[in-house]
């Protein structure tokens, strides 16, 4: 079973204290000390609970309590301690001898708050009111700035393309894109230890020579009226051949070039 509430007993006085009750409490504590606040009221002859006797003694009847208004030095000390400790009034009262936590709290709410507001200082944050209150325009600017920073990213650099198989280029890089390679059959590296055109260049040149020889043969046939059995070659020399379509001439042209 827990403790029974001290103020729910029958025949307990509640409300303001009378002078006679104050005198009884002071006389008992001076003679016997504070002791146990739960058993003190019955020993002192008071119809009060222990909590009420303790608060009456601590806040009003102690002999070391200061009477009168707070001084300017006490005001500045309370402001400084409040900026460090916040609303911990019991700790603040421990730094001010003769002042109670309840007295300091009431004095803060009735006097010091107004003094700070008149100076343009927020009593909760102890900062200037202009700095603590943010205007709607500044909030809008912050939102726009944040959106701009979130959605704007760095420009991606373009991939570097380097050609492979250039004759006059002496330097090459190891990184190329997929478009540079193309098909596997399109690029064939010439690994022979010789200086000359690449395989692609040679094959292209052979095709162009064969096409030119073929066009020349057809033009000669039409000009001299030759039949299919006789072919006229005007590439290197003029002569008649047997249904060979100037094959030897084309091969010799490719080799000489």
From Swiss-Prot:
The lineage of its organism: Eukaryota, Viridiplantae, Streptophyta, Embryophyta, Tracheophyta. Keywords: DNA-binding, Nucleus, Repeat, Transcription, Transcription regulation. GO terms for molecular function: DNA-binding transcription factor activity; transcription cis-regulatory region binding. The gene is MYB3. Interacts with CPL1. Residues 9-61, 62-116 form the HTH myb-type domain. It comes from the Eukaryota. This is Transcription factor MYB3. It is found in: Nucleus. Its main location: nucleus.
């Amino acid at each position: 079973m827990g403790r029974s509430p001290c103020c729910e007993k029958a025949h307990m006085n509640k409300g303001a204290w009378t002078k006679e009750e104050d005198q009884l409490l002071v006389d008992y504590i001076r003679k016997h000390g504070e002791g146990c606040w739960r058993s003190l009221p019955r020993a002192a002859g008071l119809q009060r609970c222990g909590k009420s006797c303790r608060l009456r003694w601590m806040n009003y009847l102690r002999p070391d309590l200061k009477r009168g208004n707070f001084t300017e030095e006490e005001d500045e000390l309370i402001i400084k301690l409040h900026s460090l400790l916040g609303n911990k009034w019991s700790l603040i009262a421990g730094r001010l001898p003769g002042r109670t936590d309840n007295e300091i709290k009431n004095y803060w709410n009735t006097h010091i708050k107004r003094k700070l507001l008149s100076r343009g200082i927020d009593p909760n944050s102890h900062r200037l009111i202009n700095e603590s209150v943010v205007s709607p325009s500044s909030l809008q600017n912050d939102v726009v700035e944040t959106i701009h920073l979130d959605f704007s990213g760095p420009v991606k650099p373009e991939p570097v393309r380097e050609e492979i198989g250039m004759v006059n280029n002496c330097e090459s890089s190891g990184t190329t894109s997929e478009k540079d390679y193309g098909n596997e059959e399109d690029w064939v590296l010439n690994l022979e230890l010789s200086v000359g055109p690449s395989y692609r260049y040679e094959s292209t040149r052979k095709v162009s020579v064969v096409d030119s020889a073929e066009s020349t043969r057809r033009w000669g046939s039409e000009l001299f009226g030759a039949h299919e059995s006789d072919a006229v070659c005007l590439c290197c020399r003029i002569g008649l051949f047997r249904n060979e379509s100037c094959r030897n001439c084309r091969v010799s042209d490719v080799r000489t070039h």
